[in-house]
């Protein structure tokens, strides 16, 4: 009987996991009924196995499921905000929002190399929305998160694998206020970010007119300090929405990574002093829409500041649901502050382990107003490293995922006319998906070569230029032959001293 109870428990957990796979609780209930009302145990187990295999096979064959970008294993993740990122005991830990019948939960994965990820049991469930992880006074990882309807909250880790957490009995740390409360209207209990400074805990409470609260103890009492922002900067209003906040020391400055639901992913550079943030500079990290969203970062043992963001699936909701999954993150970006006080960004060296089948071209010239198809370089899971020196060219770059007749193609290029790095997806697909031009401000200085790193991963194109700018788009080509790579130049010629290409090994299990 004991063995039977154990096996029933295994099937019960498998059934619940399948409910997450498909979002179909009725199927899980049917499987449980087969077990507990006398149905054959072996048949129920085999039925589950077959369904799981079928889903895995479906995901393996999905033409738009990225191979080396971090993706959800299965099911609906919208939003798919990265949360609680922390480097702990030699491992990178990344939490993320997913949805099931309980509502919003935090999934969890860890890695030692930022490439291969082990998925952990779901330990933070029901009512978990955006938040972060920091080390408390006792040296224990602590989550500060939005507890949906209840307000902002805290939880502490109970093991070094960060699998088990205890939510504070004093949660929420600061309740939502109502009419008549002395602090009503001064802050919103939303998208918190917590940290320890000296002997004091601080937290940003996000939303419009974001606030600072503080306490000497995690359990409180928490006190309202005042506005996060000391003043405005540029044309950004002091009341601009600050959500998914991430504040940290950055060189001789502080960086505030965040989003607003109007401006998308963005950042401030400035100073943290007198319990306020004094912004000096503001820039966006997405421009045409909010498809690059909800940034989250950590500091690792090498001193690297590494960030992730959710990249949105732009297909119709019905299409996303039928695919059996939805949730992709951008490649991890290493951020640092240059000597001139501006942001620099690149990729972790660890990603190079995915490269294979290297190809190199040297001293190529693309004539004015012409194209050059690279016959030996093609694919939809590749990395390109291209150095381009313009000679009068006004628009020059590379087309990826291009069909032979040009019906489908995605353009990656520098536009000297408006000094921007662009991805044009207007011809990326004959089917659905956003048609737009993403354009990030970027200027080549006199005589400077354009140094592109282009990552194509099925439905994702990410581009890095001269370690100063990055842009991203989702694409959904419909043709099997939309795998071409084409150099192009307009308004003048361009020289390509060196072009390197690699196929990229998938790191996701399916």
What are these regions (language model features)?
Residues 46-84, 115-135, 162-196, 221-246, ...:
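Surface loop/turn signatures of beta-propeller and other carbohydrate-active proteins
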Residues 4-29:
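Bacterial N-terminal signal peptides that target proteins for export
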Residues 52-56, 272-277, 282, 286-290, ...:
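Beta-rich accessory regions
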Residues 80-99, 120-122, 130-156, 173, ...:
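Hydrophobic core segments of beta-strands in well-ordered, beta-rich domains
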Residues 28-39:
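Bacterial N-terminal signal peptides
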């Amino acid at each position: 009987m004991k063995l039977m109870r154990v096996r029933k428990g295994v099937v019960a957990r498998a059934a619940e996991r399948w409910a997450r796979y498909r979002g179909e609780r009725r199927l899980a209930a049917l499987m449980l009924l087969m077990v507990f009302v006398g149905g054959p145990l072996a048949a129920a187990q085999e039925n589950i196995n077959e369904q799981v295999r079928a889903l895995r096979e479906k995901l393996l064959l999905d033409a738009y499921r990225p191979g080396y970008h971090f993706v959800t294993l299965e099911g609906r993740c919208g939003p798919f905000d990265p949360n609680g990122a922390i480097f702990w005991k030699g491992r990178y830990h990344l939490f993320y929002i997913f949805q099931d019948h309980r509502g919003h939960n935090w999934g969890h994965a860890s890695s030692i190399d930022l490439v291969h990820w082990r998925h952990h049991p779901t330990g933070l469930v029901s009512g978990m929305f955006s938040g972060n992880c920091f080390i408390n006074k006792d040296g224990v990882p602590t989550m500060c998160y939005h507890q949906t309807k209840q307000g902002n909250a805290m939880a502490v880790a109970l093991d070094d694998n960060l699998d088990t957490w205890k939510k504070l009995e004093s949660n929420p740390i600061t309740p939502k206020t109502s009419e008549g409360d002395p602090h009503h209207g001064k802050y919103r209990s939303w998208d918190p970010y917590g940290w320890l400074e000296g002997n004091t805990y601080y937290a940003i409470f996000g939303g419009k007119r974001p606030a600072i609260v503080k306490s000497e103890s995690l359990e409180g009492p928490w006190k309202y300090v005042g506005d996060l922002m000391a003043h405005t900067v540029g044309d950004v209003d002091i009341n601009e929405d600050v959500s998914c906040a991430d504040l940290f020391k950055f060189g001789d400055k502080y960086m505030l990574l965040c989003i607003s639901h109007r401006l998308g992913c963005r950042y401030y550079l400035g100073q943290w002093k007198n319990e306020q943030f004094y912004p000096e500079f503001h820039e966006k990290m997405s421009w045409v829409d909010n498809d690059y969203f909800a940034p989250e970062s950590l500091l690792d043992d090498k001193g690297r500041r590494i960030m992730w963001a959710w990249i949105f699936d732009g297909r119709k909701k019905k299409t996303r649901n039928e695919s059996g999954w939805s949730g992709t993150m951008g490649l991890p970006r290493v951020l640092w502050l240059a000597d001139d006080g501006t942001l620099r960004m690149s990729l972790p060296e660890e990603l190079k382990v995915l490269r294979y089948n290297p190809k190199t071209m040297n001293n190529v010239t693309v004539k004015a107003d012409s194209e050059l198809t690279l016959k030996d370089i093609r694919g939809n899971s590749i990395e390109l490293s291209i150095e381009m020196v313009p000679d009068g060219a006004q628009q020059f770059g590379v087309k990826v995922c291009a069909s032979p007749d040009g019906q489908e193609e995605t353009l990656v290029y520098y536009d000297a006319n408006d000094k921007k790095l662009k991805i044009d997806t207007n011809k990326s697909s004959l089917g659905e998906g956003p048609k737009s031009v993403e354009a990030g401000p970027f200027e080549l200085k006199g005589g400077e070569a354009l140094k592109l790193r282009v990552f194509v991963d099925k439905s994702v194109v990410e581009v890095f230029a001269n370690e100063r700018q990055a842009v991203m788009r989702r694409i959904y080509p419909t043709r099997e032959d939309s795998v071409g790579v084409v150099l192009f130049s307009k308004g003048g010629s361009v020289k390509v001293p060196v072009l390197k290409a690699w196929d990229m090994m998938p790191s996701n299990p399916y």
